[in-house]
Amino acid sequence: MIFNPLEQFRISVLQKLFFGNIDISITNNTIILFVILIGFTFLFYVNYSTNTYIPSKWQYAVENIYLFVLQLFKQQINNIVALKYFPLVLFVFSFILFANLIGLLPYGFTITGHIIFTFQIAFSLFFGITLINFFNNKTEFFNLFVPSGVPKPLIPFLVVIEVVSYLIRPFSLSVRLFANMLAGHTLLNILSAFIFNVFKKYALISFLPLLFIVFIIVLEFCIAIVQAYIFSILTCIYLNDIYNTSH
C-alpha cells in the first residue's frame, strides 16, 4: 500500500442524500463541522448557565478566551459603538480555534485544511463587512480607495492598486489559514510514518525522533492558536474600516 500524507484531507461520503438534484450527502467534513459547532456552543452555554462565585477550571478557561478576544478587539477598533460586532469576532476566533485543534486529535479531520472551506468563511466576512460599510458610510466608503495627500496625477494609479488590494482580502485571508494547516498536518503525518518505520527497525533509538515529533505537535498546537488569532485580528481590521474610511 502506497503511503499518502494527504489522505487525511480526503472528504469521504458517509451517507448519500439528495434534495432533488442537489447533493446534500453527509460526509466526514459535515460530522466534524457539527461537532465543532455543538462543542464550543455547549462549552459557552455551560460556562454561563452555571456561573459561580468561585469559577471552575472550565469557567476560568472560557472567561480567559473571552477577555483575550475582547482585548484584541479593543486594540484594533477604538470605538465603543463597534462593540456590537464583538460577538462576531469572538465567534470567529472560537470557531477557527476549535476547527484547528480538532484536527490534531487522533482520527480528527482538519476542515481548515481545505481552501474551499476557509474561502467560504473569509468571503462571507468580507462580503458582509463591505455591505455594512457601504450602507453606513454611503459615498464616504469610496474614500478607502483614495489615499489622502496624494498628488492628483497619481490618484488613478493608486485607486487601482487600492481596489485590487481590497478585493484580494478574502483570498489572502483564506490561503494563509489553509496553507498553514495543510503544511503542518502533512509534515506531522510524514514524520509519524517515518518514526513508525524507525521504531520497527531500530527500537532502541526510536525515542530520538519521537521527541522530535512531540516538539512538532506542540508547534502545531501553537500554530493552531496563532492562526485563529491572526484571522481574528484581520477581521477586526476590516471591521475598523467601517468607522475609519479615510487613510
UniProtKB/Swiss-Prot annotation:
One annotated GO molecular function: proton-transporting ATP synthase activity, rotational mechanism
Subcellular localization, as worded in the UniProt entry: Mitochondrion inner membrane
Top-rank taxon: Eukaryota
GO CC, any one term: mitochondrial inner membrane
Keywords: ATP synthesis, CF(0), Hydrogen ion transport, Ion transport, Membrane, Mitochondrion, Mitochondrion inner membrane, Transmembrane, Transmembrane helix, Transport
Keyword Phosphoprotein: no
A UniProt-annotated Pfam family: ATP-synt_A
InterPro entries linked to this entry: ATP_synth_F0_asu, ATP_synth_F0_asu_AS, ATP_synth_F0_asu_bact/mt, F0_ATP_A_sf
Ranges that cross the membrane: 26-46, 85-105, 115-135, 141-161, 178-198, 205-225
Mitochondrion as UniProt keyword: yes
Membrane topology, as annotated: Multi-pass membrane protein
Oligomeric form and interacting partners: F-type ATPases have 2 components, CF(1) - the catalytic core - and CF(0) - the membrane proton channel. CF(1) has five subunits: alpha(3), beta(3), gamma(1), delta(1), epsilon(1). CF(0) has three main subunits: a, b and c.
Function: Mitochondrial membrane ATP synthase (F(1)F(0) ATP synthase or Complex V) produces ATP from ADP in the presence of a proton gradient across the membrane which is generated by electron transport complexes of the respiratory chain. F-type ATPases consist of two structural domains, F(1) - containing the extramembraneous catalytic core and F(0) - containing the membrane proton channel, linked together by a central stalk and a peripheral stalk. During catalysis, ATP synthesis in the catalytic domain of F(1) is coupled via a rotary mechanism of the central stalk subunits to proton translocation.
HAMAP family documented for this protein: ATP_synth_a_bact (MF_01393)
Alphabetical list of PANTHER family matching this protein: ATP SYNTHASE SUBUNIT A
Family classification: Belongs to the ATPase A chain family.
Protein name, per record: ATP synthase subunit a
Organism of provenance: Acanthamoeba castellanii
